[in-house]
Amino acid sequence: MNEGRIRVRFAPSPTGELHVGNLRTALVAWLAARSTGRQLLVRMEDLDRHNSSATIASCQLSDLAALGLHWVGEVVFQSDRFDLYRQAIDQLTASGRVYPCFC
């Protein structure tokens, strides 16, 4: 593993306001990145399209910034990567490495 590429991430779900648990996780990730010279990334877990909101995501990011918990680079939205995930699933399925789950 390339030590220089290790990153720390915070991945909230934009389905409601940040709460104490979210903020604790964000603070721990930010402190871990800062204390080790790593980068903090933010990835929005917005695949729950029914409950996710761009307005809430924006509010969450504003709250983090207001608290001084800054990240590096653009925020990654999982929904923007859906096509990549579909390609990976298709490759795994074609190679016989996927089985249906009926749970």
Descriptions of predicted regions:
Residues 1-103:
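N-terminal Rossmann-like or analogous alpha/beta NTP/dinucleotide-binding catalytic cores
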